[in-house]
């Protein structure tokens, strides 16, 4: 079997060089028998005392060969011959009894009860070889303690998930001389974890990892969240906190070297990818992201199918997922976490820190009556009824993730018996939309949740109307659960059987839904009282302007009336003027003037006339009148008269 892990290759090279294998030194192969990937029995899990002892023997042989005074070629020949003999001795398989191996496997299954798919031949051979290597060398507890110490020696302390500087065993150097014993145990554990190749989540991860996880769970209190560090170069998980065992059931090191998106539900992978692609440009533009700047969203993560929870029927059991709220934080990789062979393109060396918190159902008992202090969540939908936004707080109350609701019609979640109530509610929404910022609370109604039950909601409705087109843009409902569902766990799968409704009821419900959508698409009219107020305000402004204009015209007419023969006056009352004109030595002239206005009044005027000897004369007269109205009027009279001797009569007409 050829190794598919870059980490195991590098570690195998260093181990083979340390052990002095002639095969690996002379051929330059990247795989060796000691790594466990070359088809030979693995010796990584054996005691480190034997390796150190062989190294000392080889060093003495080298010194002895150098001290003999022979040539460099002869010394190299002797060293190669001795190491080749040792390599042949190491490659011989160790004898083992079949009955003893079977007893050890049964005893291990009874004690550990950890791992998933024990039916695979590769996992069985690996367990047999581990039991053979461990017999007479060291106890299980000592080996686990050595693994923990080696991990602690290669790791950095983590005060918080936001300041992660831990380097996994694969990222450190594999050829250190001073840490040979710790590296051997750590590499053995890491190779066992990688032995289950990508995609085989049900395979064994090694007895050491299982024992370490069991010991850690017994010593500490269970946590309800976990964190992991992901490389943004290839999406590989570099580190996970031990609490992942309590939350999802996975051994601590099982995620290392795997892609994080493989554990995300298929329907949520697009959401996860969009959050990543959105967060990377923001982090690069800011240069350094503050610690409190997080991107939060919800996904479903895969739960571990172990033998402890479901017995040996791993393959027959379905894969289960649980909802989690993920907090993303982008950070630059520390210098200690960048080995020489870790090449990053375009100068990017970013790490993604994910803090996952499980989401639990909000209900404890069936048909629970919640208090008024229960948290609110908002759902926004367009005028066509399509949901466009959902708060993450709705997940624990409804069981849906936001991406499960967005793009669906909100009419499908209303109870069929409450559609008439919802029609009245949307009528009120359209009326309240005439006033900007108006809101109201509707009657309680039933809403469908993820497990197939209904909850009773109390909603405060608001809407936004486009001020230019007078069209409804969207409706926002701030919901609060008044009564819980009959089934407390909102994340359970909905029943396959649907509620039976008569065809008449279905047609009626369809008609009501269509009426609601048509009503929301109508133009929102302005209220009549608002129109009246605007007209009254405009009339008052126009009347004030006209009064000012008439006052100016009246003053100009009074000044020009005494010298003119014909005057046009604007007045706001009715007046009647009678003028008498006397011409020459006895001529008389009379004139009448009328004016129209908004008021009534009477006025008197005097007229003067001149006559010639022939008996003709002209006369002009002006008359003013006052009335009970609010204005004053001016009249201008002119008259002409004819006479035989000394008198003339003339008439005058006032033009308003």
From Swiss-Prot:
It comes from Drosophila simulans. Pfam families: PAS, PAS_11. A motif (Nuclear localization signal) lies at residues 53-66. The sequence shown here from 1-559 is that of strains SI-CA1, SI-CA2 and SI-K2. From 560-656 it is from strains Merano 4 and Australia. Residues 1-161, 580-656 are annotated as: Disordered. This is Period circadian protein. The lineage of its organism: Eukaryota, Metazoa, Ecdysozoa, Arthropoda, Hexapoda. InterPro entries: PAS, PAS-like_dom_sf, PAS_fold, Period_circadian_regulator. PROSITE patterns: PAS. GO terms for biological process: circadian regulation of gene expression; entrainment of circadian clock by photoperiod; negative regulation of transcription by RNA polymerase II. Residues 584-642 have a biased composition (Gly residues). Sequence repeats lie at residues 584-585, 587-588, 589-590, 591-592, 593-594, 595-596, 597-598, 599-600, 601-602, 603-604, 605-606, 607-608, 609-610, 611-612, 613-614, 615-616, 617-618, 619-620, 621-622, 623-624, 625-626, 627-628, 629-630, 631-632, 633-634, 635-636, 637-638, 639-640, 641-642, 643-644. Forms a heterodimer with timeless (TIM); the complex then translocates into the nucleus. Residues 224-359, 377-483 form the PAS domain. Residues 53-66 have a biased composition (Basic residues). Residues 584-644 are annotated as: 30 X 2 AA approximate tandem repeats of G-[TN]. Changing residue 77 to A: In strain: SI-K1. Essential for biological clock functions. Determines the period length of circadian and ultradian rhythms; an increase in PER dosage leads to shortened circadian rhythms and a decrease leads to lengthened circadian rhythms. Essential for the circadian rhythmicity of locomotor activity, eclosion behavior, and for the rhythmic component of the male courtship song that originates in the thoracic nervous system. The biological cycle depends on the rhythmic formation and nuclear localization of the TIM-PER complex. Light induces the degradation of TIM, which promotes elimination of PER. It is found in: Nucleus; Cytoplasm, Perinuclear region. Coiled coil: none annotated. Keywords: Biological rhythms, Cytoplasm, Nucleus, Phosphoprotein, Repeat. The keyword Metal-binding does not apply.
């Amino acid at each position: 079997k050829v190794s598919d892990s870059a980490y195991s290759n590098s570690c195998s090279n260093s181990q083979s060089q340390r052990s002095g294998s002639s095969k690996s030194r002379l051929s330059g192969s990247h795989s060796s028998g000691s790594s466990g990937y070359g088809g030979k029995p693995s010796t990584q899990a054996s005691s480190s005392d034997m390796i150190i002892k062989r190294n000392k023997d080889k060093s003495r042989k080298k010194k002895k060969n150098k001290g003999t005074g022979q040539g460099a070629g002869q010394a190299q020949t002797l060293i190669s011959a001795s190491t080749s003999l040792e390599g042949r001795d190491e490659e011989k398989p160790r004898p083992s009894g079949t009955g003893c191996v079977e007893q050890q496997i049964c005893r291990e299954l009874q004690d550990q009860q950890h791992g998933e798919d024990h039916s695979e031949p590769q996992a069985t051979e690996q367990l047999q070889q581990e039991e053979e290597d461990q017999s007479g060398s060291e106890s299980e507890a000592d080996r686990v303690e050595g693994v923990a110490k080696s991990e602690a020696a290669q790791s950095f302390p983590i005060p918080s998930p936001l300041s992660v500087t831990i380097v996994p065993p694969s990222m450190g150097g594999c050829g250190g001389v001073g840490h040979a014993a710790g590296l051997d145990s750590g590499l053995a554990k890491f190779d066992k974890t990688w032995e289950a190749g990508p995609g085989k989540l049900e395979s064994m991860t090694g007895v050491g990892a299982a024992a370490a996880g069991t010991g850690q769970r017994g010593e500490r209190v269970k946590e309800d969240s976990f964190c992991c560090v992901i490389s943004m170069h290839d999406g590989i998980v570099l580190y996970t906190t031990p609490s992942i065992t309590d939350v999802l059931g996975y051994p601590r090191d099982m995620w290392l070297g795997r892609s994080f998106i493989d554990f995300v539900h298929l329907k949520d992978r697009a959401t996860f990818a969009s959050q990543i692609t959105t967060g990377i440009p923001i982090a690069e533009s800011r240069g350094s992201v503050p610690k409190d700047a997080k991107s939060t969203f919800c996904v479903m993560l895969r739960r571990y199918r172990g033998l402890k929870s479901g017995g040996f029927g791993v393959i027959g059991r379905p894969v289960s997922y649980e909802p989690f709220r993920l907090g993303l934080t982008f950070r630059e990789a520390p210098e200690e976490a960048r080995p020489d062979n870790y090449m990053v393109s375009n100068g990017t060396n970013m790490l993604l820190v994910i803090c996952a918190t499980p989401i639990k159902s909000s209900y404890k008992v069936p048909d629970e009556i919640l208090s008024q202090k229960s948290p609110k969540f908002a759902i926004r939908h367009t005028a066509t009824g399509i949901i466009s936004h959902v708060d993450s707080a709705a997940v624990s109350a409804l069981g849906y993730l936001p991406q499960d609701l967005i793009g669906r019609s909100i009419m499908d979640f209303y109870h069929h018996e409450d559609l008439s109530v919802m029609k009245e509610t949307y009528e009120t929404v359209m009326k309240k939309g005439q006033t900007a910022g108006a809101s109201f609370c509707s009657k309680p109604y039933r809403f469908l949740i993820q497990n197939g039950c209904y909850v009773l909601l109390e909603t405060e409705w608001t809407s936004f109307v486009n001020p230019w087109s007078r069209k409804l843009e969207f409706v926002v409902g701030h919901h609060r659960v008044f009564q819980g569902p009959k089934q407390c766990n909102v994340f359970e799968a909905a029943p396959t059987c649907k509620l039976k409704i008569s065809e008449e009821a279905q047609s009626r419900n369809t008609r009501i839904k269509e009426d609601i959508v048509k009503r929301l698409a109508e133009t929102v009219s302005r209220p009549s009282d608002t129109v009246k107020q605007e007209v009254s305000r405009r009339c008052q402004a126009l009347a004030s302007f006209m009064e000012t204009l008439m006052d100016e015209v009246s003053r100009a007419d009074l000044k020009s009336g005494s010298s003119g023969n014909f005057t046009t006056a604007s007045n706001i009352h009715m007046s009647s003027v009678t003028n008498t004109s006397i011409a020459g030595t006895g001529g008389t002239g009379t004139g009448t003037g009328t004016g129209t206005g908004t008021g009534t009044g009477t006025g008197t005027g005097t007229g003067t006339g001149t006559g010639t000897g022939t008996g003709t004369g002209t006369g002009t007269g002006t008359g003013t009148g006052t009335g009970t109205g609010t204005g004053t009027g001016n009249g201008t009279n002119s008259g002409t008269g004819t006479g035989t001797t000394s008198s003339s009569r003339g008439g005058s007409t006032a033009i308003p």
